[in-house]
Design a protein with these regions (language model features):
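Cleavable N-terminal signal peptides
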Residues: 7-8, 18
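N-terminal secretory/targeting leader peptides
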Residues: 21-121, 137-140, 144-361
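Conserved small/polar residues in nucleotide/adenosyl-binding loops
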Residues: 1-6
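Hinge/lid segment of periplasmic solute-binding proteins
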Residues: 126-141
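Sec/Tat signal peptide C-region and signal peptidase I cleavage site
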Residues: 13-20
Length: 361
């Protein structure tokens, strides 16, 4: 809820009036700041830059209440919190909103994509321009405007025990956020739905023996490596899955010059976040090797061979088309065109999918 306090500074005999307003904005995310690049840069880049520029370039002031780590809305509540105005600006993973934002998850539905977050982010931005219905649905259905996109570094699997062939994961309970669970369930693993804040306990209590996650989280503040020290670089890909939105009612109440600053700084924020996310990926892998050695594990980080990657992709090759059909059926959007456009644009970057998924037709 955007709150405004106004004072009128009159010049002459009411001939003109200048309004100096103080706006209060609630900004937040369900994830914590330190271990996640998209929230960390929200706190360190977006918020301070908005404050500084509004103070320096306008007659207004902005007071920002920051609410990370679910203080106002948990990971699966942020979209609704922005919709209702509980948060004026929110950042969240569309992976937790498959019932409402299934089409936004299209890169999840084309696994073994690029492992570079900055590349995937750039390609996904191209797709957003080609398919404006994606951003429009946020405005038409959920009272919020898309202002930025970030994401997570290359997904792999952390496990309690070492393994070599993909077939060894059959029958093993593996945790994931939700829409990416078929990556392993279709291969024979037992899927367990969880979120970043609860995954550690799920591993610690034996609910699962593995987790689909990204290195920066596995080695970083979430410390999943303590329970699952063996990391396998699978090559599922980096995913531009997190977005930032602003409540439309809030946006309408803001002076144009303030709104302009927010939109501009949102662009700076997303660039900083994806760059940081990619850097965290490299650091995460390095840290996992070091942490493994401290435990006496010399093979803490290993790589899935390309032949195994192709076997994996072949096993799940019909799933992307199934998801495309769901997008078309339930959202009135051409899911096949959307996902084929994504693969086309990704291949223009030089990426080669182990299996070129057949979608549509």
């Amino acid at each position: 809820m955007c709150i405004r306090d106004s004072s009128i500074l009159a010049t002459g005999i009411m001939a003109s009036a200048s309004f100096a307003d103080t706006f209060t904005l609630r900004v937040g995310s369900g994830h914590p700041s330190k271990p996640t690049a998209y929230v960390g840069n929200m706190e360190k880049v977006l918020v301070p830059n908005i404050k500084k520029r509004v103070a320096a370039e306008t007659n207004h002031k902005v007071r920002i209440i920051e609410a990370y780590a679910g203080k106002i809305a948990k990971v699966h509540e942020t979209l609704e919190a922005v919709e209702k105005g509980l948060l004026d600006i929110g950042s969240y993973c569309v992976c937790f909103e498959t019932a409402k934002l299934l089409p936004w998850n299209f890169d999840y539905f084309v696994p073994f994509t690029t492992t570079n977050l900055e590349t995937n982010w750039a390609v996904k931005h191209k797709i957003l321009k080609q398919f404006p219905a994606l951003t429009k649905m946020l405005e038409d259905k959920y009272n919020q405007k898309f202002i930025a996109m970030q994401g997570f570094d290359d997904y792999g699997i952390g496990t309690v025990k070492q393994w070599q062939k993909a077939s060894e994961l059959k029958g093993v309970k593996v945790i994931a956020a939700g829409p990416n669970l078929p990556w392993v369930s279709l291969f024979g693993s037992i899927p367990v739905t969880s979120t970043l804040p609860t995954m550690y306990n799920d591993l610690a209590t034996g609910v699962a023996k593995g987790v689909i996650i990204f290195p920066s989280a596995h080695a970083g503040g979430f410390k999943f490596y303590e329970q699952a020290p063996y990391w396998k670089v699978i090559g599922f890909g980096a995913m531009a899955q997190t977005i930032t939105t602003i409540n439309l009612d809030t946006l309408k109440k803001l002076p144009p010059e303030v709104a302009k600053i927010i939109m501009e700084e949102a662009k700076n924020y997303e660039k900083a976040a994806v760059k940081d996310g990619q850097q965290r990926y490299q650091k995460g892998l390095t840290d996992l090797v070091k942490l493994g050695k401290k435990k006496g594990i010399n093979d803490a980080v290993t790589y899935l061979p390309l032949d195994q990657q192709k076997i994996w992709a072949e096993t799940i090759k019909d799933w992307p088309n199934s998801r495309a059909k769901d997008i078309t059926k339930d959202y009135g959007m051409d899911g096949a065109a959307l996902m084929n456009a994504y693969m086309d644009e990704m291949e223009k970057t030089g990426h080669k999918f182990p299996v070129r998924y057949k979608i549509g037709g």
